[in-house]
Curated annotation (Swiss-Prot):
EC number(s) on file: 3.2.1.22
Organism, as annotated: Coffea arabica
Catalyses which reaction(s): Hydrolysis of terminal, non-reducing alpha-D-galactose residues in alpha-D-galactosides, including galactose oligosaccharides, galactomannans and galactolipids
Disulfide bond residue pairs: C36-C68, C116-C147
Source taxonomy: Eukaryota, Viridiplantae, Streptophyta, Embryophyta, Tracheophyta
GO CC term, one of those recorded: plant-type cell wall
UniProt name for this protein: Alpha-galactosidase
Presence of the UniProt keyword Disulfide bond in the record: yes
Amino acid sequence: MVKSPGTEDYTRRSLLANGLGLTPPMGWNSWNHFRCNLDEKLIRETADAMVSKGLAALGYKYINLDDCWAELNRDSQGNLVPKGSTFPSGIKALADYVHSKGLKLGIYSDAGTQTCSKTMPGSLGHEEQDAKTFASWGVDYLKYDNCNNNNISPKERYPIMSKALLNSGRSIFFSLCEWGEEDPATWAKEVGNSWRTTGDIDDSWSSMTSRADMNDKWASYAGPGGWNDPDMLEVGNGGMTTTEYRSHFSIWALAKAPLLIGCDIRSMDGATFQLLSNAEVIAVNQDKLGVQGNKVKTYGDLEVWAGPLSGKRVAVALWNRGSSTATITAYWSDVGLPSTAVVNARDLWAHSTEKSVKGQISAAVDAHDSKMYVLTPQ
């Protein structure tokens, strides 16, 4: 039940009422690969591929349109209008199709006068109307960007859409995208289900690693219902090696980031599928305890990331950011285990288990690669 504004419960966590985001969202978004080149055929084919390739069964449920899906101007009633040339059937028909596959449809708007592409209107001043439109179409997720915002603080603009979505009559996941500018981790849990902590990612090692670091400092603010978002996945887009993409996916999973695929899944190669479909890594991301793992130890370019899981287990990643193979060691004292603990160590990428490990775990890790483990006390 939604409490009325002003009551303590409402102030503390207004969006618990939508019941969404108890684990980080999983799915796909059009922006990283397609930018403004999206149409209803692409969205339908992506939904088909999500199911036929087995990704939907692994938890990838959201099929999200990003910028450029609407006409430049609203209609005579002030409503957003899907672009006739690219979405001739309209968004409701598209949502119906996506829902028929057992998936959910996401859409995009902006807390400003226009979206970032300037090819369609933003929702500033139209929040109630647009939220009702999205609900009437059967939309399940809204990414809400931060361009052309008239220099009004996001702390003022985003709660208006948050309340509009709560009043829309439909449960809609609310993804804040103000790029971490006003430290949303400190205030957005009352407003949305996820919040970007960084500027946009691009498909490069330097961008990916810097997003991971920027996101990491906010780890303590994440939890069920509200997640830090270091931006969408670049896995499969070609700008990094398979090794680097493995690190990207491992750290995003450990950090409880939204796992939103950003490549063309219709034509992804086997290596990309192997990364995105690792059920053991996904299980770390989706663990019901919902504690964001973080960087616990650094030895120059060698890093240990770790976080607790349900059942007294611990997830650990050994990440080599250097240019040559090196041995990385995680000591129990660094990862939150009692020094006397004896664990079974499951290697999530090799799919093998080492039994009765004491005190520490070490591995030789190739340049830019990572090893990922779940440690289960005996």
